[in-house]
UniProtKB/Swiss-Prot annotation:
FMN binds at residues 18-20, 70, 139, 172, 212-214, 234-235. Its cofactor is FMN. This is tRNA-dihydrouridine(20/20a) synthase. Its EC number is 1.3.1.-, 1.3.1.91. InterPro entries: Aldolase_TIM, DUS-like_FMN-bd, DUS_fam, DusA, tRNA_hU_synthase_CS. The gene is dusA. Keywords: Flavoprotein, FMN, NADP, Oxidoreductase, RNA-binding, tRNA processing, tRNA-binding. Belongs to the Dus family. DusA subfamily. It comes from Escherichia coli O6:H1 (strain CFT073 / ATCC 700928 / UPEC).
């Protein structure tokens, strides 16, 4: 497990994307044990859930820092209210979702469809910036539907950075189809256009920009960093979290030893014990840990044992200890 480390680089140099149903608080706690410096994002949380919901949608562990809250919404006043609450809770950044293409999100008038209304996005960002001192950022695509020209993208960035005073953008290097494709298909079918994102950074050198989409290794991340201020990794970091073990050293220049996956599992035990005592099921935590040993002998046995046993009544850390033994036996 990496120790607290110091780096000359900002946290946004390498971040984990907000992913619905994946980057919950259990996932983020686990990922933090693999990298001290990586910027973590929550799942998208709607303004309606925060303002009217019964649960605590802003809950997180102090150990997760640096951590950003991604908001979904299009009402400037509601977003400002939620941003203020998030800052009071200690979040390090507020991010506005202008990239998710799902029907559920569009029906709520937020996500990628907002890209067609740059002035509204600017109003939303400005409303949040006016009430918080932490960074307010925007995650978006390179276009939507047939509005996919470079001129359209530049106009969007111009408006949101100018009238909205947004200083940082995370650009998913694909356009989004607002109808006809599922969210999963929208992550795979529209072609990646990294050169367009690089060009955007060159044309807006005063803005901070991170690139997202299809990045599968630290080598690829380092190549993107030749052109961009930051790199955001999504599915690969979730499905193969072991790649984060070297992030502090390779991306942030830390002298710390890379995180050891077995040590990371055992470092989870106090957190797991605490969560189990509060009624959390073991499987709700371990589902995020299934890919930890990918590429290591015993990975399949690890995944299978956890998948078959972590959901059972009374499952506790003994399940993890047994799964670790299966990995050790294969080494």
């Amino acid at each position: 497990m990496p120790a607290e480390s110091h780096t000359v680089y900002p946290a946004y140099r390498f971040s984990i994307a907000p992913m619905l149903d994946w980057t919950d608080r259990h996932c983020r706690y686990f990922l933090r044990l693999l990298s001290r410096n990586t910027l973590l994002y929550t799942e998208m949380v709607t303004t309606g859930a925060i303002i009217h919901g019964k649960g605590d949608y802003l809950a997180y562990s102090e150990e997760e820092h640096p951590v950003a809250l991604q908001l979904g919404g299009s009402d400037p006043a509601a977003l400002a209210q939620c941003a203020k609450l998030a800052e009071a809770r200690g979040y390090d950044e507020i991010n506005l979702n202008v990239g998710c293409p799902s029907d559920r999100v569009q029906n709520g008038m937020f996500g990628a469809c907002l890209m067609g209304n740059a002035q509204l996005v600017a109003d939303c960002v400005k409303a949040m910036r006016d009430v918080v001192s932490i960074p307010v950022t925007v995650k978006t695509r390179i276009g939507i539907d047939d509005q996919d020209s470079y001129e359209f993208l530049c106009d969007f960035i111009n408006t949101v950075s100018g009238k909205g005073e947004c200083e940082m953008f995370i650009i998913h290097a694909r356009k989004a189809w607002l109808s006809g494709l599922s969210p999963k298909e929208n992550r795979e079918i529209p072609p990646l256009d990294y050169p367009r994102v690089y060009q955007l950074k060159r044309d807006f050198p005063h803005l901070t920009m991170s690139i997202n989409g299809g990045i599968k290794s630290l080598e690829e991340a380092k190549a993107h960093l030749q052109h961009m201020d930051g790199v955001m990794v999504g599915r690969e970091a979730y499905q193969n979290p072991g790649i984060l073990a070297a992030v502090d050293r390779e991306i942030f220049g830390s002298s710390d030893t890379d995180a050891d996956p077995v040590a990371v599992v055992r470092a989870m035990y106090p957190y797991i014990e605490r969560e189990l005592s509060q009624g959390t099921y073991l499987g709700h935590i371990t589902r995020h840990m299934l890919g930890l040993f990918q590429g290591i002998p015993g990975a399949r046995q690890w995944r299978r044992y956890l998948s078959e046993n972590a959901h059972k009544a009374g499952a506790d850390i003994n399940v993890l200890e047994h799964a670790l033994k299966l990995v050790a036996d294969k080494r």
